[in-house]
């Protein structure tokens, strides 16, 4: 496809408050995104790998499922930051680091024309995908977060007063959720 990206790398640093970054890598393999939002509050990062919007209105009517080996890394330091991720295909990795109060995965609804189910999320569709996360100080892994497919893995380390709702559908999937401190909740579905 003319819209496919292969072996591309995007590296973005935003070191203040109220920033937005959106990266879409369409339909290709071996793509890498690294986002660093440190030193500020109210930042939003959006990463989408392996699908194409066919109508320009966030409609996933023609997803590309043959993507693989894509990586995304998001680091957010500060308060009230949020991010969302969507990866389609196999052998994709998502690494998340958040430090500060009120940070979320699957966060704020900043795009009013996008359906709620597609506005804030972490989602990986495919096999052998990995999500590694570190969250501290009252962070939330939102209920819109999913892994679909087989042999997927979630490894999440959270500090005090954190919340996680982890949903996986498929076979031979694993979840490791370490929560330290008080006031934590965790559900695995």
Predicted features by range, described:
Residues 1-189:
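Low-complexity repeat regions of mature extracellularly deployed or surface/particle-associated proteins
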């Amino acid at each position: 496809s003319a819209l496919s990206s292969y072996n591309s790398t995007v590296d973005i640093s935003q070191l203040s408050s109220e920033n937005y970054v959106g990266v879409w890598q369409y339909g290709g393999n071996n793509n890498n995104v690294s986002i660093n939002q440190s030193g500020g509050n109210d930042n939003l990062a959006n990463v989408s790998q392996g699908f194409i919007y066919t109508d320009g209105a966030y409609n996933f009517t023609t997803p590309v499922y043959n993507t693989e080996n894509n990586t995304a890394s998001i680091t957010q330091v500060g308060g009230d930051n949020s991010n969302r991720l969507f990866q389609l295909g196999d052998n994709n990795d998502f690494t998340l680091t958040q430090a500060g109060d009120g940070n979320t995965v699957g966060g704020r609804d900043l795009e009013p024309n996008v359906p709620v189910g597609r506005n804030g999320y972490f989602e990986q569709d495919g096999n052998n995908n990995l999500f590694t996360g570190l969250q501290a100080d009252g962070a939330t892994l939102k209920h819109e977060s999913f892994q679909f497919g087989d042999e997927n893995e979630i490894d999440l380390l959270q500090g005090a007063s954190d919340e996680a709702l982890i949903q996986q559908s498929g076979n031979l999937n694993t979840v490791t959720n370490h929560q330290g401190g008080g006031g934590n909740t965790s559900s695995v579905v």
